Amino acid sequence: MEFPPLWLCLGFHFLIVEWRSGPGTATAASQGGCKVVDGVADCRGLNLASVPSSLPPHSRMLILDANPLKDLWNHSLQAYPRLENLSLHSCHLDRISHYAFREQGHLRNLVLADNRLSENYKESAAALHTLLGLRRLDLSGNSLTEDMAALMLQNLSSLEVVSLARNTLMRLDDSIFEGLEHLVELDLQRNYIFEIEGGAFDGLTELRRLNLAYNNLPCIVDFSLTQLRFLNVSYNILEWFLAAREEVAFELEILDLSHNQLLFFPLLPQCGKLHTLLLQDNNMGFYRELYNTSSPQEMVAQFLLVDGNVTNITTVNLWEEFSSSDLSALRFLDMSQNQFRHLPDGFLKKTPSLSHLNLNQNCLKMLHIREHEPPGALTELDLSHNQLAELHLAPGLTGSLRNLRVFNLSSNQLLGVPTGLFDNASSITTIDMSHNQISLCPQMVPVDWEGPPSCVDFRNMGSLRSLSLDGCGLKALQDCPFQGTSLTHLDLSSNWGVLNGSISPLWAVAPTLQVLSLRDVGLGSGAAEMDFSAFGNLRALDLSGNSLTSFPKFKGSLALRTLDLRRNSLTALPQRVVSEQPLRGLQTIYLSQNPYDCCGVEGWGALQQHFKTVADLSMVTCNLSSKIVRVVELPEGLPQGCKWEQVDTGLFYLVLILPSCLTLLVACTVVFLTFKKPLLQVIKSRCHWSSIY
């Protein structure tokens, strides 16, 4: 929740002036490289070493950002006495001469961010003191200390907005902002502030917005800026936030205490208008139930506040936590990334106007739903990434979530939800129960069922539009579990076997589905079962991580724009993929990590022409002669390694065997002729019989 730099505001003001020509409109002109239109001179980034002197003298806005001016001399701006806005952002300024602004009586907004004004700060301060009508001043990024800042702001009582962000302020006292009784907005983020003396802001009676983010404040005690409406103290090292205990009305509406080291829920004003409270990423918890209330002396903390010669002692009951804080106007509460193990009784009852509650990434194990807890105005509830094993619904309670629209229960330990939890939840549109080991009820659960929750029933939830059941270990769907809903987004990913190889359990919601994720659900290659023709409004389909060997079927008029077929068993790209009319509207398709055969990707060129984006084109590979080749590197036409496959197989083997047989025959003949005579002699000698005569 940082403030936009003032130079951005000026830039926006400049951009709304259109560069056009026509009746009654000044024509954009170039003056030494600067663009000039309607009294605005834009000289950004022109490598100027000095302020140009040839611009129209009636210019009201001069933008000199990103020019190496280094110095602003007494005569630099004399030619432009009507300036109202001047931006010198990143101009390497280290000196502003004493009378540089002497002729600038109309100047209202001045941006000096990201320069080196600390080097000659006394002379620069003297120049600023002549701007008696200045309202906005940006001194961020100038390496200013608190003494330098005090001198520069001295006597500038007309200021309404000041930025001292990204400087080297460390300790604040009442002398820095003395005399700024009209100041409305103060930006002190990204300094090194570790201490703020009591009364440092007391003179700023009109202050409404204060940004102290990204500093080193260890605590805020006795906070008493009743006129403040916005306070950002995020990204400090706060361990305590204690508002003054006086029963006085506070105007504070937005309080950002996120990304600190708070141990306890902040002690807020007893009477206030707070509607947004940001507490994420702290170390908070509720501790009342963990301590023995019979020992009151062990339940208080005393803060010793030393202000000059005055010492004050503030005593705080540690375990009263939220009881004395006024939360009646609170609408947005973010308590994520803390150490909350439970919500104490009555906590949510103190927030009747609460519409958004974020409790993700805590240690909640159980949540009790009672009357007015959560409040009836709640529209968004995030309980994800906790340790929830049980949700308790008070007996006879109905309509507790009647205005709830978004309910996130993902990444918990739930087995089911209480019967009747979603009764009369007529506004709910989004439910995320992914990564819980739940099961879907095979049939409607009786209203009077009093047993422990063992399943979840989504039937007849007419308002439900988005349902995520990713990684829930669901068994095969039976009996149309989504009947009576009008789902547009459904995620059943990482539930192996949930569809039992067929998409027929989804036909009840096929006409309304727009986004369907069936990643890693065990879909096979049955062509009849993979027909998505009935899903007429489907825009995005994720079928990655399955075992598909052929493209799914799409017929009729289909609105499909994104198709993900990664990590399947596809070996070829059938020609019908390109020729089918429903697929020609695809804008993005994912096809990588499939065992394609390089001899079966003849339609790849046509595929690239018809589909606007093959998102993973560079990662699509195929198998060619036991080698993995990227499809984009294949030569045009049929690859050489595929030509042999076009020849008759019998002829191929004949050609392969015939040379071997001929070689063997010739070898045998040569051997026989070579050893013919010795061989005959051996035969005769061994086969000789003696004569009987």
Swiss-Prot record:
Effect of residue 219 to A: Abolishes formation of disulfide bonds and ability to interact with TGFB1
Entry GO CC: cell surface; endoplasmic reticulum; endoplasmic reticulum membrane; extracellular region; plasma membrane
Reported induction: Down-regulated by IFN-gamma (IFNG), LPS or TNF-alpha in bone marrow-derived macrophages (BMDMs).
GO molecular function: receptor ligand inhibitor activity; transforming growth factor beta binding
Membrane topology qualifier: Single-pass type I membrane protein
UniProt-annotated location(s): Cell membrane; Endoplasmic reticulum membrane
Protein's name in the database: Transforming growth factor beta activator LRRC33
Organism: Mus musculus (Mouse)
